[in-house]
């Protein structure tokens, strides 16, 4: 049976740019009716051409924009629904991991409840897609995975999602971790994650090869965290792309954070950026507002054809007390940090 068509009338859409009498650029808009069937826009009809049969819900000129994609998140880490608690300061990533490990077992039973609260907040901010990394580790094994999976399945009619099985406390440190990763991928994990093959696993090649082994076994994509900077971080990105090329890997690939992209030698930048673009390896940034971290060169990457996506990372968890989960706020931060002020620049960023 064919689903009926839903009509949204008097929807304001952007149509282009124009200049006013002061030669200032502004965005032109016009009103339309959107014909939607089975969740997809089937037709965009100028409002003055709408027939009686196409009358539906009047949106009174509200502006319609594409839904947001929450491209880097940790649904299992949030404290949402448990009441207020602040994060504890640490000196480095290893201290942060130790701090997190101390509370993992306490938080695990409430994973579904907490993830549900976070999903609802993200949907409220306009997200129609969530890519969440979920801890797979010896402390909680698959408990967080099952809780997040149940939470996401409740909203499958509203959002699309990916579950990245993520060895937050190292892929190679405990032989049980790879077995747990494999079990999660058998049961609904959609991507393989990783964490700092040098800084955490101390074995760049072995860590990356293991990640690609898992991805090939289950025919899924890869999205690794890479905080390592300097030549080590750049080498890791190069080695990631080398392995991708050697294996002729065709699933989706992404590198999250990728701070080392700022440390690429000038003579090598064009080649590396082109490799990322050629293999459609996306960069996932959380627009860190933190002087200890550096924003990857997003504008230069995009000009080189590299796909860049934004996410909130974790918010209201042991890692951060401050992030809201509002992706529009992330975009504003990005525009402020990179000096985007003109109508064209703002529109392109959004």
What does each model-identified segment do?
Residues 79-111, 236-254, 272, 324-338:
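Active-site gating loops and adjacent loop-to-helix segments of metal-dependent hydrolytic enzymes
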Residues 1-51:
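N-terminal metal-binding scaffold of metallo-dependent hydrolase/deaminase domains
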Residues 66-78, 134, 221-230:
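Histidine-centered catalytic micro-motifs
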Residues 165-174, 186-295:
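Active-site core of metal-dependent hydrolases
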Residues 64, 81-133, 139-154, 180-186:
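Alpha-helical scaffold segments that flank or form the walls of functional sites
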Residues 11-16, 122, 277-282, 286-292, ...:
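C-terminal helical cap
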Residues 246-253, 299-350:
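His/Asp/Glu-enriched, well-ordered alpha-helical/loop segment
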């Amino acid at each position: 049976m064919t689903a009926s068509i839903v009509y949204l009338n008097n929807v304001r859409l952007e149509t282009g740019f124009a200049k006013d009498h002061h030669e200032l650029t502004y965005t032109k808009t016009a009103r339309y009716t959107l014909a939607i069937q089975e969740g997809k826009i089937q037709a965009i009809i100028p409002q003055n051409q709408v027939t009686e049969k196409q009358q539906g819900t009047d949106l009174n000129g509200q502006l319609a924009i594409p839904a947001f994609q929450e491209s880097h998140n940790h649904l299992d880490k949030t404290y949402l629904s448990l009441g207020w608690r602040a994060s504890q300061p640490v000196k480095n990533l290893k201290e942060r991991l130790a701090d997190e490990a101390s509370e993992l077992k306490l938080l695990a039973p409430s994973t579904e409840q907490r993830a549900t609260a976070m999903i609802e907040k993200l949907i409220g901010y306009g997200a129609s897609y969530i890519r969440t990394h979920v801890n797979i580790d010896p402390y909680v094994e698959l408990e967080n995975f099952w809780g997040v999976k149940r939470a996401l399945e409740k909203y499958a009619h509203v959002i699309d999602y990916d579950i990245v099985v993520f060895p937050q406390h190292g892929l190679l440190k405990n032989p049980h971790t790879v077995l747990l990763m494999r079990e999660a991928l058998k049961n609904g994990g959609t991507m393989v994650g990783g964490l700092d093959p040098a800084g955490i696993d101390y074995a760049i090649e072995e860590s990356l090869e293991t990640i690609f082994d898992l991805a090939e076994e289950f025919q899924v994509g890869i999205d690794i965290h890479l905080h390592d900077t300097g030549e080590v971080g750049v080498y890791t990105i190069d080695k990631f792309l080398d392995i991708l090329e050697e294996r002729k890997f065709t699933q989706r690939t992404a590198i999250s954070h990728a701070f080392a992209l700022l440390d690429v030698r000038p003579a090598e930048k064009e080649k590396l950026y082109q490799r990322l673009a050629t293999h459609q390896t996306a960069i996932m940034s959380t627009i860190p507002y933190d002087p200890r971290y550096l924003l990857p060169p997003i504008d230069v990457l995009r000009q080189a054809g590299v796909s860049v996506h934004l996410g909130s990372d974790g918010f209201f968890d042991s890692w951060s007390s401050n992030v809201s989960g509002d992706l529009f706020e992330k975009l504003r931060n990005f525009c402020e940090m990179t000096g985007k002020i003109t109508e064209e620049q703002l529109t392109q960023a959004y």
